[in-house]
């Protein structure tokens, strides 16, 4: 069975794993998922991530991060969906929780946070919000 929205599946796996205090979560890998994991690591929301080949299929492993027994990621939600894409110009890029969270944006220069997109002066597809 094909997956209609692999990014939503990734975010749901992270949300569910943190809900039961898992140390890490494993999922099928893709270039886009690895790029999202890199942004999450750079922003300090996850410990680390790695991509391994298992039986001809690439698997993405994300090490989850906790502080005082609570997940560092309080909220992670998909914004642009396959049925309703959400694009924002450089002047319309949203602030997540007044700057306390980040929006991950797919731009012509690659994936980046809302802050970096504003600084670079580019817009793009708003993939998800993380807080």
UniProtKB/Swiss-Prot annotation:
InterPro entries in UniProt: Ribosomal_uS8, Ribosomal_uS8_CS, Ribosomal_uS8_sf
Pfam families with a match to the protein in the record: Ribosomal_S8 (PF00410)
GO MF terms, alphabetically ordered: rRNA binding; structural constituent of ribosome
GO cellular component: ribonucleoprotein complex; ribosome
Organism superkingdom: Bacteria
Keyword Ribosomal protein: yes
PANTHER family xref list: 40S RIBOSOMAL PROTEIN S15A (PTHR11758)
Family: Belongs to the universal ribosomal protein uS8 family.
Protein function: One of the primary rRNA binding proteins, it binds directly to 16S rRNA central domain where it helps coordinate assembly of the platform of the 30S subunit.
Protein's UniProt name: Small ribosomal subunit protein uS8
Organism annotation: Cupriavidus metallidurans (strain ATCC 43123 / DSM 2839 / NBRC 102507 / CH34)
Taxon lineage: Bacteria, Pseudomonadati, Pseudomonadota, Betaproteobacteria, Burkholderiales
Name of the gene: rpsH
